[in-house]
């Protein structure tokens, strides 16, 4: 299984989702590898922090850039799950990964500047589907406001995804400090004791996305 987390706009939480996905699957006894294809190296730094924390399980992480198609095909024969953090830009790494990924998760914040990228992202998905028709593609609305008065913004964002042929998950993530706190020490919200709502969000998201 190759799970690709990517998109065209930075700041939507792709690295955070990649990390939490990987930890979740590891807790389910899957042999997981993280591949950081983002030039910023956020997930690589996270994995190093995690390795230095004796209270956390080690989660292997490698870096790669450019055309990573063959790299992913090789890694998929050695690990049960490869989770790819492709970062927030249209890159050769993102495009090449889309040709072999079994699952593609596209995070969007419920903001106009994020949703404007749907035009181009949907075109990339269409191109990838021509050579990788079995890839499961889902959008997810992230960093959502928790105020009840803002629910319509979330619904509108999901509708925007649908209008471009990208099926959104019912599950969302909300704007919670614990996501940033966990990222800074190599942890995940699944291992944090401070905010169980964030843990429930990730568990719901992964269960819906991967049906596990």
Stretch-by-stretch model annotation:
Residues 118-134:
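Conserved C-terminal guanine-recognition region of P-loop GTPase G domains, centered on the G4
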């Amino acid at each position: 299984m190759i799970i690709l987390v990517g998109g065209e706009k930075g700041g939507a939480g792709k690295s955070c989702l990649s990390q939490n996905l990987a930890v979740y699957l590891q807790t389910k006894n899957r042999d997981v590898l993280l591949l950081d294809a983002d030039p910023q190296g956020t997930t690589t730094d996270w994995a190093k922090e995690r390795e230095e924390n004796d209270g956390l399980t080690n989660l292997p992480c490698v870096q790669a850039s450019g055309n990573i198609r063959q790299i992913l095909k090789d890694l998929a024969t050695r690990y049960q799950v490869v989770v790819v953090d492709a970062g927030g830009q249209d890159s050769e790494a993102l495009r090449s990964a889309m040709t072999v990924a079994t699952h593609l998760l596209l995070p969007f914040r419920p903001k106009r500047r994020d949703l404007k990228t749907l035009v181009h992202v949907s075109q990339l998905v269409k191109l990838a589907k021509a050579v990788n028709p079995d890839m499961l593609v889902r959008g997810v609305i992230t960093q959502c406001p928790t105020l009840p008065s803002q629910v319509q913004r979330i619904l509108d964002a999901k509708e925007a995804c649908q209008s471009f042929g990208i099926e959104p998950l019912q599950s969302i993530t909300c704007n919670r400090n614990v996501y940033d706190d966990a990222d800074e020490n190599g942890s995940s919200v699944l291992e944090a004791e401070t905010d169980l709502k964030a843990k429930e969000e990730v568990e719901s998201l992964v269960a819906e996305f991967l049906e596990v």
